Regions:
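P-loop NTPase Walker
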Residues: 1-73
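Glycine-rich phosphate-binding "P-loop"
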Residues: 1-12, 125-130, 248-268
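Accessory N-terminal region flanking or inserted into the helicase ATPase core
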Residues: 2-7, 84-154, 163-164, 168, ...
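A short acidic, amphipathic alpha-helical/loop segment
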Residues: 17-21, 45, 142, 164-172
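Conserved RecA-like ASCE P-loop NTPase motor core of nucleic-acid helicases/translocases
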Residues: 18, 27-39, 57, 224-229, ...
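Loop/turn-to-beta-strand initiation segments
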Residues: 28, 151-152, 176-180
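Signature of the SF2 helicase/ATPase Hel1-core->accessory helical subdomain module
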Residues: 159-210
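Conserved coupling/interface region of RecA-like P-loop/ASCE motor cores
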Residues: 190-201, 207-252
Length: 269
């Protein structure tokens, strides 16, 4: 199988690239992305280029993907209760009480309090960890099932995945499917959760994760395919490249002259 991590420049046509790649496939394709806004953008691009989303292409947000393919089919190995969806959280969930030195949280052994609200909605910051636990308990059947359902998987906004998300990515990279990950580490906007696990790979350090944690897994690191920006001219690209020297020089496909091009510095009054 062919796995690939593509480091994309801002305005490089990432969405167009993903859609065109998916349109070339005859087998089942999954495109998953972190934000709802980007999911809608991908759907719009399919309509623009193809008139519709092809029947063999599924587009889901990362959370929806994990719930449908990781949680619901395998939750029985952990609990028999009915799960009533999820609840988005922006801080660590499962607080037991406020202690003298800060919040005290439920242990994972109390899984109902650790993973769920009283109404059995799963905390968003625990979904990936729950899926990883299912993967471990079933000896890899979660990733096996996903790979059989989708021989080709495209993960957009890879820079926003964190913590246990990365373990799920690692499992998929070892499964019988082609995984293409695309993202711009210079544009980390959100994190799926603030987990201590793999903290050193936060802020878009997916390349470092692949090189360090996936050494025995074949994965091409591609810094060329989406390295030219259609949005920014060379002055802007060169300035940006100086801020992120570790990613090399970004090129441009933007050659229009408007009279107000380039980088400007304003004075504070």
């Amino acid at each position: 199988m062919v796995n690939r991590l593509i480091i994309a420049a801002a305005g490089s046509g990432k969405t167009t690239y993903l859609v065109r790649q998916a349109m070339q496939q005859s087998d089942s394709v999954l495109i998953t992305t972190y934000t709802i806004a980007n999911e809608l953008e991908i759907r719009k691009k399919f309509v623009e280029l193809n008139g519709c989303v092809p029947h063999n292409v599924t587009i889901q947000t990362w959370y929806s993907f994990l719930l449908q393919h990781g949680v619901r089919p395998f939750q029985g190995v952990i609990l028999d209760d009915k799960i009533n969806g999820m609840i988005l959280v922006n801080e660590k969930s499962g607080k037991k009480y406020d202690g003298k030195y800060g919040p005290v949280y439920y242990a994972e052994t109390d899984y109902r309090k650790f993973y769920f609200t009283d109404g059995m909605k799963m905390y968003s910051d625990k979904i990936a960890k729950f899926v990883c636990r299912c993967e471990k308990e079933t000896k890899g059947k979660v990733s096996q099932r996903i790979s059989k359902s989708y021989p080709r998987i495209y993960v957009d906004e890879i820079q926003d995945l964190a913590g246990y998300d990365l373990d799920i990515i690692k499992s998929l990279l070892q499964a019988e499917c082609d995984v293409t990950m695309v993202g711009d580490p210079r544009q980390v906007t959100y994190h799926t959760h603030n987990e201590a696990k793999y903290k050193k790979y936060a802020d878009g350090k997916m390349e470092e994760f692949i090189r360090s944690e996936c050494k025995k897994i074949d994965c091409i690191i591609d810094k060329e395919t989406l390295n030219d920006s259609y949005r920014n001219n060379q002055s802007i690209c060169s300035y940006s490249s100086q801020l992120y020297e570790e990613y090399g020089e970004t090129g441009t496909k933007q050659f229009d002259i408007t009279g107000h091009d380039g980088v400007f510095f304003g004075e504070t009054r």
